């Protein structure tokens, strides 16, 4: 059972759609060394990650992201979320982004 993920390699991808969606055993994901500026879709990225408790996305470059639909929807255990440096100027869809995030 996966409980923790540490991202240390930066791949050349543009979409993170449903990347961790449905991973209901993960408690934390470390993006400490992650920086990418060509991502355009983060929809459903953490959808239904019901055991995820902390998430630091302060290193994310979101300048080109246009879709954050349901990004954190269903993350009902999320207690700590760092979105410092998040740029949402180009985002066209943030609907349901924080649906069922209670904390």
Regions found by a protein language model. Name each.
Residues 3-11, 25-38, 50-66, 77-90, ...:
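Structural signature of tandem-repeat unit edges
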Residues 15-23, 40-49, 66-75, 92-101:
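Core hydrophobic positions of leucine-rich repeats
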């Amino acid at each position: 059972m996966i409980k923790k993920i540490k991202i240390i390699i930066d791949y050349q991808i543009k979409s993170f759609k449903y990347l961790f969606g449905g991973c209901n055993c993960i408690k934390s994901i470390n993006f400490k060394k992650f920086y990418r500026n060509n991502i355009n879709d983060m929809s459903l990225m953490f959808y239904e990650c019901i055991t995820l408790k902390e998430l630091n996305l302060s290193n994310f470059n979101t300048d080109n992201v246009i879709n954050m639909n349901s990004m954190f929807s269903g993350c009902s255990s999320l207690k700590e979320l760092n979105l410092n440096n998040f740029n949402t100027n180009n985002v066209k869809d943030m609907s349901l982004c924080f649906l069922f995030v209670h904390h």
